[in-house]
């Protein structure tokens, strides 16, 4: 917590519990000193430890190999999606992140995303905070799949199968 001490001391706590209390009686509650009076309950120790472990794991990876794997998955998915009738890839710059955005002509992106969800495939749908750009190009929304070092070609194949089924079912 950051602030001028005089202001922090004059502010009342907004939560109660744990180490933020100095003493409690039936007549009065006395709050601890700054910053402790704003730290209700037990700190989130388990998640801090988990974050440290995750950071250690990520630091142990060969980042170059991970990036190459991610880009390989993106290229594979792009190739397979481009082979499907009615699928149009959006954003095909040669150097980009391991993300594939696409539309299926005649289908609503949200409907496709919901169908893929029933298959256990997680995608994002919609404007992705780029509504003015999509409006400019007449795109009502896209389906976006992203790939990380832990994804596999088999998972991309499940995505492709799901998109194929969605086209057959929803068209």
Regions found by a protein language model. Give the residues of each.
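Pyridoxal 5′-phosphate
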Residues: 1-171
